[in-house]
Regions:
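Structural microenvironment flanking redox-active thiols in thiol-disulfide oxidoreductases
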Residues: 67-108, 118-125
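A short beta-strand-turn-helix
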Residues: 33-54, 77-80
Length: 167
């Protein structure tokens, strides 16, 4: 069935394919809403932050580049605390353990809101195939940038954060 859809869609120029048929999420499209528990078991939805720019970082405690970039995310979280920018770390808990997440955050003084993707549903919805993966989402809920891999330096996080705030 997938092959037939590809054959049918390949007859049209890319810009004429209806947005509903394009695999999402991607730059220029709305970020899919989700609801996940945080470390205190409180349910958090992306839509709770509609109207604010959001940086979503998918990570795991066993991932070396994830661990290397987490201090930059923590520093950015502290620097932008007075703004409407939201920085959220989504742990790929289906590939990690809550105990490892808690140990990592306590050991490294991480205070960024951490959501637990225990089933992997949100990671699949966001097409996360490599960790870390970071989505930069505008105030209107549109994906502005996606960076796969890391570690991201603080300087790049600042550039992206400032762009989201000014947008």
């Amino acid at each position: 069935m997938t092959g037939l859809a590809w054959i049918w869609l390949s007859r049209f120029p890319v810009d004429s394919i209806p947005a509903s048929l394009v695999e999402a999420p991607q730059v220029g499209f709305s970020a899919p809403d989700f609801t996940l528990p945080d470390l205190d078991s409180q349910e958090i939805s992306l839509s709770d932050y509609r109207g604010s720019p959001v940086i979503l970082n998918f990570w795991a405690s066993w991932c070396p580049p994830c661990k290397a970039e987490m201090p930059a995310f923590q520093k950015a979280f502290q620097e932008y605390a007075g703004s409407d920018l939201q920085i959220i770390a989504i742990n790929a808990t289906n590939q990690d353990s809550i105990a490892a997440v808690l140990s990592f955050t306590e050991e490294h003084g991480i205070t960024i809101p951490i959501l637990l993707d225990q089933t992997g549903f949100v990671s699949k919805e966001y097409l996360v195939h490599s960790l870390p993966t970071t989505y930069f989402i505008g105030k209107d809920g549109t994906i502005k940038e996606v960076i796969i891999g890391g570690p991201l330096p603080l300087s790049l996080l600042r550039i992206q954060a400032n762009g989201l705030i000014m947008d």
